[in-house]
Design a protein with these regions (language model features):
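Bacterial N-terminal signal peptides
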Residues: 7-19
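Positively charged n-region of N-terminal signal peptides that target proteins for export
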Residues: 1-5
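N-terminal soluble domains immediately following signal/targeting peptides that reside
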Residues: 22-140
């Protein structure tokens, strides 16, 4: 009888724990990235991370940012830099030193309580940064 109770308790515990884990696994980060020129080929970036479902700020994560040019894969890429937490929860700051102007795909890697990767493609010009324009699609 004791063995049956133990099995029932373990089964109930698993039933309660598994949904919580699956909910945590579904949490995704949303990233708003704003960059501005800070010098020749250097850009100061502010990243605001939120939970994509609840819109709550994601504080306490380790954020690293890498970049590469989608038009020239593996030719131009930037070693990832660690972002520093900003003044408000969920806000992070980093300086990117790029190799040239143009479209860069930023890879935002989150570690800690939430592990995720967010990709954002931006156009870095000498005087401003804006969302990259999408290449025209061709139908054949």
């Amino acid at each position: 009888m004791t063995r049956v109770r133990l099995i029932c308790v373990l089964a109930a515990t698993c039933a309660v724990c598994l949904p919580a884990e699956s909910v945590l696994a579904q949490v995704r980060a949303k990233a708003d990235v704003m960059c501005r020129p800070a010098g020749t080929l250097q850009y100061d970036c502010t990243i605001v991370l939120t939970n994509s479902r609840t819109k709550e700020p994601l504080a306490g994560v380790t954020l690293t940012i890498g970049a590469d040019m989608p038009s020239m894969p593996m030719m131009h890429n930037v070693r990832p830099v660690k972002a520093e937490p900003g003044e408000t929860p969920g806000t992070y700051r980093a300086r990117l030193a790029l190799e040239m102007h143009g479209d860069w795909a930023l890879q935002l890697n989150l570690a800690g309580p939430l592990r995720d990767r967010v990709l954002r493609t931006l156009r870095f010009d000498p005087d401003r940064v804006m969302p990259a324009t999408k290449a025209p699609s061709h139908k054949h």
